[in-house]
Regions:
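N-terminal active-site segment of His-dependent metallophosphoesterases
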Residues: 1-70, 350-355, 359-362
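A conserved active-site cap/scaffold subdomain adjacent to cofactor or substrate pockets
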Residues: 188, 194-258
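Short coil/turn segments at beta-strand junctions that form active-site/ligand-binding loops
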Residues: 1, 47-49, 81, 149, ...
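His/Asp/Glu-rich metal-coordinating catalytic cores
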Residues: 22, 50, 59-204, 208-213
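Accessory, non-catalytic peripheral segments of nucleic-acid enzymes
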Residues: 229-362
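Conserved beta-strand elements of the Class I
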Residues: 4, 124-126, 223
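A short, well-ordered alpha-helical element
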Residues: 37-47, 142, 256-270
Length: 362
């Protein structure tokens, strides 16, 4: 039994991170569609009979009917594949939802908030989703009805949340899930992929197949699974999608003496055009770092943000000449430096000086 498992595509969600780049948000929406097309093409090429979409397929507040029609058109291209959709907290099963009002392809089954079992050949698929934008009901007690069949649970929510967590979205316990005897538990809601192995049982978050910001770094993709009909042995593969990813790039700017040097330093880096970058500046600087100005001076469209984590470089000898509190601090540190012998002690004193100067400059 082969399947694809995905979640959290958030179709038509506003790409706030890309808002200041001309046409980037529209391009990202097109990329979202293309990611779904990639998965459908994979299904066609590999003859996959099941497609699981575990919540937040689209963004209820922003979704366009044209997008729904496009996605449904893709679903019609795979008539022999059974498609199961779980409504999530961003696309709940509510009165004006396209899940309720749109005529979907005949191979699509949409779950509601009530637990339901769908029988398919040698497979029983259980599922339930959201009927509102927030749902913190405890996970319902579920036991599989026929252990001889392959049993799959699909839902959307938080797994093993802390007692201190303020908002819990359909909280679930891995211990209870394990006891319920499912052969595969496909989840959505967490955008980072996670395979949890509980005594051979897989509880899987596929992660989002396309990221929308720097809180979702690195490669994105979907899960391809296979459960042996006889042994029920499970194998999983993560398949990357081609959409642009978000990455962080740490840059030591110590050797930049002027703002222009820093701009040139960044422009000389060979960035991957299929990635969006946030540059994090480290090291020391001896000029005021204006990240917005530097970003505007760059010739690179895929640099989205610059964050300054560098520290000011202080000339302790020059500062000691000042008639000020800063000068007194510098003189005091210089006197102490003459009295210590080890490099470690000197480093501690210089760090104390930097902390003091940073405090003065706040």
């Amino acid at each position: 039994m082969k399947f694809i498992h995905t979640a959290d595509l958030h179709l038509d969600s506003p790409a706030v991170t890309l808002a200041e780049i001309p046409n980037a948000t529209s391009a990202r929406r097109i990329e979202q569609r293309m990611v779904m097309k990639e998965m459908v093409e994979y299904i066609i090429k590999n003859n996959i009979p099941y497609f699981f979409i575990c919540g937040d397929l689209y963004e209820q507040e922003y979704i366009r009917q044209s997008t729904i029609e496009y996605i449904n058109g893709l679903f019609k291209m795979i008539p022999d594949t059974k498609i199961f959709i779980i409504p999530g907290n961003h696309d709940p099963y509510i009165n004006n939802s396209f899940y309720k009002t749109f005529k979907w392809s005949s191979n699509v089954h949409i779950f509601t908030s009530k637990l339901e079992k769908v029988e398919c050949d040698n497979v029983d698929i259980y599922g339930y989703g959201f009927n509102d934008f927030y749902m913190n009901n405890n996970y319902p007690q579920i036991e599989v009805q026929n252990v001889d069949k392959i049993n799959i649970l699909l839902t959307h929510g938080d797994l093993d949340t802390s007692e201190n967590e303020v908002r819990k979205y359909n909280p679930m316990s891995s211990r209870i899930l394990k006891d319920s005897k499912f052969d595969y538990i496909g989840l959505g809601h967490i955008h980072k992929k996670s395979f949890e192995d509980y005594e051979g049982q897989k509880i899987v978050y596929p992660g989002s197949p396309i990221s929308m910001g720097f809180d979702e770094l690195g490669e994105r993709g979907f899960i391809v699974g296979n459960i042996d009909d006889e042994s029920k042995k499970l194998s999983l593969e993560f398949v990357k999608t081609s959409a642009k990813t978000f990455e962080e790039y740490y840059l030591d700017m110590t050797n930049a003496n002027l703002e222009e040097d820093l701009v040139q330093m960044i422009n000389n880096i060979k960035f991957d055009n299929n990635k969006y970058y946030k540059i994090i500046l480290t090291g020391k600087h001896n000029f005021e770092v204006d990240t917005k100005k530097i970003l505007a001076l760059l010739n690179l469209q895929n640099i989205i943000k610059i964050k300054d984590e560098s520290k000011m470089s202080y000339d302790i000898s020059e500062i000691a000449k000042q008639v000020s509190l800063k000068g007194l601090l510098a003189k005091n540190i210089l006197n102490k430096l003459k009295m210590v012998n080890t490099d470690e002690e000197k480093e501690e004193l210089l760090q104390a000086f930097e902390v003091g100067m940073d405090a003065f400059n706040k």
